[in-house]
Amino acid sequence: MLEADLVNNINHYLEMKGIRYSNELRMGIGISDITLNFGANRRLKPLDDYFLVSILAYVNKKRKVTFFDIQEMFLLGLEKVKQYVFTLANLGLVVIKNTLVKIVKNIFSVNLGTTISIEAKLKDWKGACLQAQRYLCFSDYSYVALPSETIKNVDLSIFQESGIGLLSIKGKNIEEILPAKESVSCDYILKYISTSKVIEKNVDVEKRHLRANVFTSYILT
């Protein structure tokens, strides 16, 4: 078995359960094998750039700013600032009048639901646990997925101390060996970006298609 086979088996499980997910989500601090989401607003604006969301958050907080204010805050060149601001304007989130930028729509009260990341490994459960901890910066919960025959080698205390959950994979079946603990370091902007990417890749997956699954306890009601 290859790690790709393990990931494909998990993907199959998620598809059968009607769960929205994305593979190899690149977040700068790591690439999670699988990131899934429950309950996020399906009309989430597709913002996948950290500076783009950060600038929007800054404008939203100040209500109106100048291009110069943004330059000073983010240490960006004027052309780059204009590029970001015009992108936000095209999305209908800000308006521009001369050099003044005003907020139009507040996206920071939108429901992001629950985001869960999974790191899949065949044997290196220690390395996987360390990687999974990084994903807590943009996920509410994080798991390591291992083949069922590898589970016997795992020191569960390491997972319990770090708050990382553990999944046993046998074929296309998943068993939760240890539940994950909620992240205390999940950053809203990073979560928005990761959730945005998952929603964008799952426009045809609807909540009513959900089936009972090992992650059901994390579904927001």
Residue ranges and their predicted role:
Residues V81, I103, A128, I151-K152:
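Amphipathic coiled-coil/heptad-repeat helices and related helical stalk/stem segments
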Residues A132:
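Catalytic core segments in nucleotide and nucleic-acid processing enzymes
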Residues H12, G18, R26-G28, G39-S54, ...:
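Non-catalytic C-terminal interaction segments of nucleic acid-processing enzymes
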Residues M1-F38, L47-L100, T221:
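Acidic-basic catalytic patches of nuclease active cores, encompassing PD-(D/E)XK
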Residues I10, I34-A40, T114-L122, S142:
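Conserved catalytic cores of phosphodiester-cleaving nucleases, focusing on short active-site segments
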Residues T99-V110:
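Accessory beta->alpha helical hairpin/"wing" motif in late/C-terminal subdomains of nucleic-acid enzymes
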Residues D124-W125, S139-N173:
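Nucleic-acid nuclease catalytic cores
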